[in-house]
Amino acid sequence: MAKHVTTREKRRARIRRKISGTELRPRLTIYKSLKHMYAQLVDDVAGKTLVSVATTSKSLKGELGDEDKTAAAKKVGEALAKAAKAKGIEQVVFDRNGFDYHGRVEAVAAAAREAGLKF
């Protein structure tokens, strides 16, 4: 039985071979489904998630209301940067997880940069 590997999965593997997060400079990884956006800061050395924010999280659920997906992605980026600053994280390595740097992925990255994270 042949194993089907999508183009995004190939891109994701190629990116992950090149980048890795540490405690001082964790990896900001993004996942998007058709409805929701997920972003987290990962320390690959220890294998731990340091900060996690999603459109499904309780802290954002009330704020989002009836906004479109791109606006919700911006709020995820802002909330992630705020939580990272609270933990003393200033710099990150950006992992787009094989998704095109466009639309919601770009919105999360731009909002995180505006809120003070350095890529």
UniProtKB/Swiss-Prot annotation:
Kindly state one GO CC term assigned in the UniProt record: cytosolic large ribosomal subunit
Listed Pfam families: Ribosomal_L18p
Which UniProt keyword terms apply here? Ribonucleoprotein, Ribosomal protein, RNA-binding, rRNA-binding
Which GO BP terms sit in this record? Answer: translation
Q: Which InterPro entries match?
A: Ribosomal_uL18_bac-type, Ribosomal_uL18_bac/euk
Q: Which GO terms describe its molecular function?
A: 5S rRNA binding; structural constituent of ribosome
Subunit comment: Part of the 50S ribosomal subunit; part of the 5S rRNA/L5/L18/L25 subcomplex. Contacts the 5S and 23S rRNAs.
- Give the protein family: Belongs to the universal ribosomal protein uL18 family.
Q: What is this protein called?
A: Large ribosomal subunit protein uL18
Q: Which taxonomic lineage does the organism of this UniProt entry have?
A: Bacteria, Pseudomonadati, Myxococcota, Myxococcia, Myxococcales
